[in-house]
């Protein structure tokens, strides 16, 4: 596994900023679904062709990698719904391009987790782009809670550290087997 784009971070930042933090995210993608990306196709593609998206896998991003203000300047005075739609489209296309470029098979299930798994508009766009070769499923179909995957991962990493078991991360981060973190025994 690897990071392929901004996920929800730019969408969430936009919604929080646009609503004076009244809302934390675009529930079900309702605002984005009202928007139009067609007038901004050039800006979306320009953003996706930036150096940021020219990576080799495995890859890891941080929220600091994605500059909402820079993208908003590219859009000019676009209506809020259009901005939300464009940000959602960047996330959707970054996932699509990562699968297209790096998935060794031409047919596989794609499991969504995190807040994006609950964003109906984002999921519908992914289904359209990926088609039937890559069916979209919510990770809850495997008995896992979408919002808790990252927390569960860090708990697992902590457990491995406490028992002194090295973790093999080469396929997901490129790192050599190692013990992560430090335990204060005081």
Tell me the role of every PLM-derived stretch:
Residues 107-129:
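Glycine-rich phosphate-binding loops at beta-strand->alpha-helix junctions
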Residues 6-11, 87, 122, 147-150, ...:
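Catalytic-loop motifs flanking and including active-site residues across diverse enzymes
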Residues 89, 140-186:
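Glycine-rich phosphate-binding/hydrolytic loop that grips phosphoryl groups
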Residues 134-136:
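Generic structural signal for residues in well-ordered beta-strands
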Residues 11-14, 71, 95, 99, ...:
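Buried hydrophobic packing segments
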């Amino acid at each position: 596994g690897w990071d392929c784009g901004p996920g929800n971070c730019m969408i969430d930042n936009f919604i929080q900023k646009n609503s004076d933090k009244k809302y934390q995210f675009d529930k079900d993608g309702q605002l984005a679904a009202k928007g139009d990306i067609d007038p901004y196709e050039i800006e979306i593609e320009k953003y996706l062709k930036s150096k940021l998206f020219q990576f080799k896998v495995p890859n890891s991003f941080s929220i600091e990698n994605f500059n909402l203000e820079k993208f908003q300047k590219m859009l000019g005075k676009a209506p809020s719904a259009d901005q939300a739609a464009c940000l959602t489209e960047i996330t959707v296309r970054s996932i699509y391009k990562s699968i297209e470029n790096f998935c060794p098979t031409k047919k596989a299930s794609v499991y969504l987790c995190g807040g994006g798994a609950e964003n109906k508009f984002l999921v519908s766009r992914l289904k359209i782009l990926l088609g039937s070769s890559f069916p979209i499923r919510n990770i809850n179909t495997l008995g896992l809670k979408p919002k808790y995957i990252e927390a569960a991962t860090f708990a697992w990493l902590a457990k491995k550290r406490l028992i002194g078991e090295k973790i093999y991360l080469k396929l997901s981060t490129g790192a050599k087997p190692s013990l992560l973190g430090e335990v204060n025994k005081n």
